[in-house]
Regions:
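Conserved catalytic core of two-metal-ion nucleotidyltransferases
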Residues: 1-7
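The feature captures the alpha-helical scaffold/lid subdomain characteristic of nucleotidyltransferase
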Residues: 15-24, 28-133
Length: 133
């Protein structure tokens, strides 16, 4: 396995309280890092990666994620390419430096706001990038 569980998984995550107990949740960067490697015929976790990026792109420590990926950064580049196709309006919210570091073009804003919805619906009719109606 490329994404090994280590101290950073438990030391750096946000603190949450469950039933009065303070616990640390897994940091989003570690979760994305591990899910990028799940590309099997019967299971692919990239949809989870897209949803995490969509919900938390502003709070992701992209430098840390890229450091964890190291030579496997092309996996993130591939996921971001697909994400920018699925949600071109939202992909532009990811800081430009991330795109530059991965040598990807910065996504152009879509002239059609319904484009993200239509493209996501091609892959799955569940409401990926929108609230349920």
């Amino acid at each position: 396995y490329r994404a090994q569980v280590d101290e950073q998984w438990l030391a750096c995550g946000p603190e949450i309280v469950i039933r009065g107990e303070a616990l640390r949740a897994i940091p989003i960067e570690e979760l994305i890092w591990s899910k990028l490697y799940v590309l099997q015929r019967e299971r692919c976790d990239w949809t989870d990666v897209f949803k995490l990026i969509d919900a938390q792109s502003a709070s992701i420590d992209w430098d840390h994620l890229l450091e964890r990926l190291a030579d496997d950064a092309p996996l993130l580049a591939g996921a971001l390419e697909v994400y920018s196709w699925l949600a071109p309006d939202r992909a532009g919210q990811i800081e430009q430096g991330v795109w530059e570091r991965l040598q990807l073009p910065y996504p152009a804003l879509s002239p059609n706001p319904e484009l993200s919805r239509a493209r996501a619906d091609l892959l799955d009719s569940r409401p990926w990038f929108r609230t349920q109606e």
